[in-house]
């Protein structure tokens, strides 16, 4: 059965602790108008469309952390790990630039 982004976010919310994976701070409650902004795609949906609905590609973070994600070591580590995995699956060399 196909899953959409909203269903995926709900699954992640049920499975994970409700704290930012970047800072450890408590997240906004479900129902808050910014709730859906707490789901951060590590690899962008545009550049990595096959990872759009991949739970591994989504981190929980506060809305204000979303804009400064590159400042957090946890984000950098996850991004680099997923890039290696993505490019390894496609057998295309990845050049970090």
Region locations from a protein language model:
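Polybasic, low-complexity binding patches
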Residues: 46-60, 64-97
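Alpha-helical structural elements
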Residues: 4, 8, 32, 81, ...
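Histidine-centered nuclease catalytic patch
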Residues: 25-58
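Extended interaction regions within the primary functional domain
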Residues: 1-13, 42-44, 62-63, 75
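Short, charged surface segments at domain edges that flank catalytic/cofactor-binding sites
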Residues: 1-24, 49-52
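Short Cys/His-rich metal-coordination motifs, predominantly Zn2+-binding knuckles/fingers
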Residues: 23-25, 64-65
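Residue-level detector of short coil/turn "hinge" positions at structural boundaries
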Residues: 20, 27, 76-77
């Amino acid at each position: 059965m196909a899953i959409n982004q909203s269903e995926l976010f709900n699954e992640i919310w049920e499975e994970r602790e409700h704290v930012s994976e970047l800072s450890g701070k408590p997240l906004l409650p479900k129902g808050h108008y910014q709730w859906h902004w707490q789901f951060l795609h590590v690899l962008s949906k545009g550049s990595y469309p096959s990872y759009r609905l991949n739970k591994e590609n989504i981190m929980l973070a506060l809305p204000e952390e979303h804009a400064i994600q590159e400042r957090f070591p946890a984000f950098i580590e996850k991004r680099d790990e997923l890039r290696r995995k993505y490019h390894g699956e496609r057998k295309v060399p990845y050049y970090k630039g």
